[in-house]
UniProtKB/Swiss-Prot annotation:
Disulfide bonds join C41-C56, C43-C51, C50-C73, C64-C70, C69-C94, C82-C101. Keywords: Cell adhesion impairing toxin, Disulfide bond, Hemostasis impairing toxin, Hydrolase, Metal-binding, Metalloprotease, Platelet aggregation inhibiting toxin, Protease, Secreted, Toxin, Zinc, Zymogen. Residues 20-35 form a propeptide. GO terms for cellular component: extracellular region; plasma membrane. Residues 1-19 form the Peptidase M12B domain. It comes from the Eukaryota. Its EC number is 3.4.24.-. Monomeric (disintegrin). Belongs to the venom metalloproteinase (M12B) family. P-II subfamily. P-IIa sub-subfamily. It is found in: Secreted. Binds 1 zinc ion per subunit. This is Zinc metalloproteinase/disintegrin. InterPro entries: Disintegrin_CS, Disintegrin_dom, Disintegrin_dom_sf.
C-alpha cells in the first residue's frame, strides 16, 4: 500500500507526531482523558493509584500517572525503549525525566 510505504520511508512528522495531551484549549473536565491546564493527571477513575481523583493532582511522591515512559507512577529509566524503530529510524527512548516518549528523529 502506497500510504504505508510513504509513512515508513518518509516518516512525516506532521502526520506521525501525536499532539501533547497538554496542548488543549478546552475547559478542564474530569475523566475526559485530556490533561488540561491546572490538572497534573486525568482524574476520571478513582482506581488510578497515581492520581488523586478529588483534586486531579498526582498523589504525594508520585511522578506520573500515565504515558509510555510511566510505570507504576514513576518515570522509566533513561534509555528504556518506549517506541520501537520504524523503517530506518532508531528506537525512541525515555529520558528518565518525563512520562512522554520523545521521538528521537535520527536515522539508524
Amino acid at each position: 500500500n502506497e500510504y504505508q510505504t510513504y509513512l515508513t520511508d518518509r516518516n512525516p512528522q506532521c502526520i506521525l507526531n501525536e499532539p501533547l495531551r497538554t496542548d488543549t484549549v478546552s475547559t478542564p473536565v474530569s475523566g475526559n482523558e485530556l490533561l488540561e491546564a491546572g490538572k497534573e493527571c486525568d482524574c476520571g477513575a478513582p482506581a488510578n493509584p497515581c492520581c488523586d481523583a478529588a483534586t486531579c493532582k498526582l498523589r504525594p511522591g508520585e511522578q506520573c500517572a500515565e504515558g509510555l515512559c510511566c510505570d507504576q507512577c514513576r518515570f522509566m529509566k533513561e534509555g528504556t525503549i518506549c517506541q520501537e524503530a520504524k523503517g530506518d529510524w532508531n528506537d525512541d527512548t525515555c529520558t528518565g525525566q518525563s512520562a512522554d516518549c520523545p521521538r528521537n528523529g535520527f536515522y539508524g
